[in-house]
Regions:
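Membrane-interface junctions at transmembrane-helix termini in multi-pass inner-membrane proteins
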Residues: 12, 73-82, 132-155, 178, ...
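N-terminal membrane topogenesis motif
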Residues: 1-34, 67, 72-75, 79-90, ...
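Signature of the first transmembrane helix
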Residues: 3, 11-68, 95-109, 124-129, ...
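Hydrophobic alpha-helical transmembrane segments
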Residues: 120-127, 155-201, 217-218, 254-256, ...
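Interhelical loop/hinge segments that connect adjacent transmembrane helices in multipass membrane
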Residues: 2-11, 15, 150, 193-238, ...
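Membrane-proximal transmembrane or re-entrant/amphipathic helices at the cytosolic face
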Residues: 2-5, 9, 405, 419, ...
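Specific pore-lining/lateral-gate transmembrane helices of multi-pass inner-membrane transport
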Residues: 76-92, 251-367
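Transmembrane helical elements of multi-pass membrane transporters/channels
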Residues: 18-33, 180-183, 187, 191, ...
């Protein structure tokens, strides 16, 4: 017996429903994530958050190996037999168990790296999460392969709520950073229970004779790319933790969660829509690049507008969401929002890499961009936590032109100047909006923090409204409206 991906009959309808479920689930996860940042910041100190960030910035690398790319391998396989699925389950479970042991044994070394004894015991308890996640991997992949996006969305939302609930209860007992480990384990355990119950299958004993070499090779290629990305995403935390201690790292980590992680989650559903559409348009030349251009502009008038507001209103936003003891995180939040602007606008390049299937050049570009990021962070760290944030803001501003140049070397007909001007234009508009937000926040300061945030948000929208006087901005908005109409029409046609 074998498991095949859903056939073409009704696939469009299921894809549309799945996209809606995924988007709804993503929206709820973002809300829960923000609520978690706000609530736990009120219950725990910057040092507590810094200690947990020390654990995860190093131990978290095990999560890359835990999956080993085998979940994606199982999802994309044309045919997956029941025995292959069971064998993959046991492989992922064994990897999870091995990594849990490895992280446990590494705990004293991680603590020594940071000079914080408590990190060792925190790491030892957190290691259990890698075992739980390893066991859950193929159950989750099975739901994904079967296009059961509602089940996945429910799992993610419920697990996040369970984790937050456990974390809050433990935090109220006054145990500090242990509450964050409890939140991690609560979410991991809830995920395992839910995906195992919803997947509707149980693994059989492992047996040889079923070919899985192709899955391993696919997985290794995924791991290589994810490793590079992981290093780039965590070098800042390691540098701050080692050089400046848990208090500074805790401040930085909360700002990172608010700016970078939220922007990443906002981009994810857009990427999930853009990549398959661009894959269908590969042979249509001009239409393909028109969609890339308009998609880039669309990001500039949605996610980047929010980031522009955060850049200008970082001080009142930090005070409102995190509280007064986190005031030192405000300039970091502003700088990380700048980094998120350039990362968001460069997302269109990532769509091209994936939709065109040029993952080799993508891996090599990632090596270059991560090297730039590491260099900027190390140089910036000479001026403390704020210097690291400056380095992280500069790095994507230096990397995006390289990405466009890289693509133009691999693919012919790339409208490099048009795409580059789009990024520059959207970045300038973000600066314009941020300036309005900052000025409005200053003027509203006597009225309190909430009034500052509201005034800054309104001022950001006013700034973009004024910018609409420019013909190029009006053309941008017209293009975005046209694409949205086409997508709605396409969705309606596929749902019939």
């Amino acid at each position: 017996m074998s498991d095949r991906p859903a056939g073409s009959d009704g696939l469009g309808r299921r894809a549309v429903r799945g996209a809606a479920a995924t988007s709804a689930g993503q929206g709820l996860r973002i809300v829960i994530q923000l609520a978690s940042v706000v609530i736990m910041a009120r219950l725990l100190t910057p040092t507590d958050h810094g200690l947990f960030a020390m654990v995860m910035s190093i131990a978290g690398i095990a999560e890359v190996f835990r999956d080993f790319g085998l979940s994606q391998a199982a999802v994309q396989a044309p045919v997956l037999t029941k025995q292959q699925r069971s064998n993959l389950f046991w492989i992922n479970s064994a990897i999870g168990a091995a990594l849990a042991v490895l992280v446990f044994l590494s705990s004293w070394g991680i603590a020594a790296l940071y000079g914080e004894e408590e990190v060792a015991s925190l790491t030892q308890l957190a290691s259990v999460a890698f075992l739980l996640n390893g066991v859950a991997t193929q159950f989750r992949a099975s739901l994904n392969r079967s296009l059961r996006f509602h089940a996945l969305a429910i799992t993610d939302v419920v697990a996040a709520l369970v984790g937050l609930g456990v974390g809050v209860v433990v935090a109220l007992t006054g145990v500090g950073a242990w509450a964050l480990v409890a939140q991690l384990l609560g979410a991991s355990f809830a995920t395992l229970v839910l995906v195992a119950a919803l997947a509707g299958w149980l693994p059989t004993a492992p047996r040889s004779g079923e070919p899985i070499g192709g899955f391993i090779r696919f997985g290794w290629n995924m791991v290589a790319t994810q490793m590079v990305t992981y290093v780039g995403n965590n070098v800042d935390s390691v540098v701050i933790g080692v050089r400046f201690g848990p208090d500074q790292l805790g401040l930085y980590n909360r700002a990172y969660q608010l700016a970078m992680n939220t922007a990443n989650q906002l981009r994810a559903p857009i990427t999930n829509v853009a990549v398959p559409i661009l894959s269908r348009l590969q042979a249509e030349g001009a239409k393909y690049w028109d969609f890339v251009r308009v998609g880039q502009v669309g990001l500039g008038y949605t996610i980047v507008v929010v980031l522009a507001f955060v850049i200008g209103a970082a001080v009142p936003v930090t005070a409102l969401l995190l509280g007064p003891r986190w005031a030192a995180a405000a300039p970091v939040l502003s700088l990380l929002a700048v980094a998120a602007v350039f990362q968001t606008l460069n997302s269109a390049s990532y769509w091209v890499y994936i939709s065109k299937g040029i993952t080799g050049p993508l891996f090599r570009y990632n090596l270059v961009s991560v090297s730039i990021k590491v260099a900027c962070i190390l140089i910036g760290s000479q001026w403390g936590m704020l210097g690291v944030a400056v380095g992280l803001a500069i790095a994507p501003a230096l990397s995006w032109p390289i990405s466009l140049f890289w693509i133009s070397r691999v693919i012919g007909g790339v409208p490099t100047r048009t795409l580059a001007w789009g990024i520059v234009r959207m970045a300038l508009l973000a600066g314009w909006g941020a300036a309005f937000a900052y000025a409005a926040g200053l003027l509203a300061a006597p009225l309190g923090v909430l009034a500052q945030v509201i005034a800054a948000a309104v001022a950001t929208l006013v700034a973009y409204g004024i910018a609409a006087i420019l013909p190029v901005v009006r053309r941008d908005l017209g293009d975005v409206r046209t694409v949205l109409r086409l997508l709605r029409r396409d969705r309606t046609n596929r749902d019939r």
